[in-house]
Curated annotation (Swiss-Prot):
It comes from the Bacteria. GO terms for cellular component: bacterial nucleoid. This is DNA repair protein RecO. Disulfide bonds: none annotated. It comes from Rhizobium meliloti (strain 1021).
Length: 247
């Protein structure tokens, strides 16, 4: 059994004296693990860092085996990803989200989204918005997608300012007003509005996705959300607040 694909490194762990087991995200083969012989060598260590884009060739005697990776560098961005807290926490949090999905299950749109996000992790506003959209996409692929396109009560497509915590559907201002204290806020940038993401709207967006991830994924599985997500959210909102104050 063998295949080749482009990939983004999610993480590695030591294996034996000189090898590592690499975890990658690929467009055609999903999240995949493989042994990299001499992966701890001076040549390979800089390549096998989270966030780097590589070409992987996987080979195993049987499909269910761990198999081995041969890895060639494509774009080494890991050095820049350690320069800011948003990028350090961001790449860890993205990997944790992808681990919610079954191993070897292809999600090409998530791979494409990941490739975009890793190049924007140092820009807090872009990174925050892209991360929230990534969480929504993961929820959707797990079968818990939110419907933010129209009001779940009236069918209206305008003035969508709430999300029902029960149905996961958008609710317009008029229909949701009597129950506003029980609703989740829907930021303008997630409802097709023209306002760019800022500190306030991103904070609301992070609360929105956290609620549904906890309800549908973490609590049923009996696990906690990755601490890296909290780190990313804190770093992103702090950076946006500082930028706003400076302006």
């Amino acid at each position: 059994m063998q295949w080749s694909d482009e990939a983004i490194i999610l993480g590695i762990r030591r294996h034996g004296e000189s090898s590592v087991i690499a975890e990658v995200m690929t467009p055609g083969h999903g999240r995949h693990l493989g042994l990299v012989r001499s992966g701890r060598s001076r040549t390979m260590q800089p390549v096998l860092q989270p966030g780097n884009s590589v070409e992987v060739s996987w080979r195993a005697r049987l499909d269910e085996h761990l198999g081995e990776f041969r890895v060639e560098p494509l774009q080494l961005r890991a050095a820049s990803l350690i320069e800011t807290a948003t990028s350090v926490y961001g790449i860890q949090a993205l990997g944790a989200l992808l681990r919610l999905l079954p191993e070897r299950d292809p999600h090409p749109h998530l791979y494409e989204a990941l490739a975009v996000i890793v190049d924007h992790l140092q820009d807090p506003a872009d990174a925050g918005e892209l991360f929230v959209r990534f969480e929504l996409a993961v929820l959707n692929d797990l079968g818990f997608g939110l419907d933010l396109s129209r009001c779940g009560a009236t069918g209206a497509r305008s003035e969508l300012v709430y999300v029902s915590p029960k149905s996961g559907r958008a609710i317009c201002r008029e229909a949701g007003a009597p129950y506003a204290d029980r609703m989740l806020a829907l930021p303008d940038f997630l409802s097709g509005g023209s306002r760019a993401a800022d500190h306030e709207s991103l904070a609301a967006a992070f609360r929105l996705t956290a609620y549904f991830l906890n309800r549908h994924v973490y609590e049923p599985r009996g696990v906690d959300a990755a601490s890296a997500r909290d780190g990313f959210v804190h770093a992103t909102l702090k950076a946006l607040k500082s930028a706003s104050s400076a302006a």
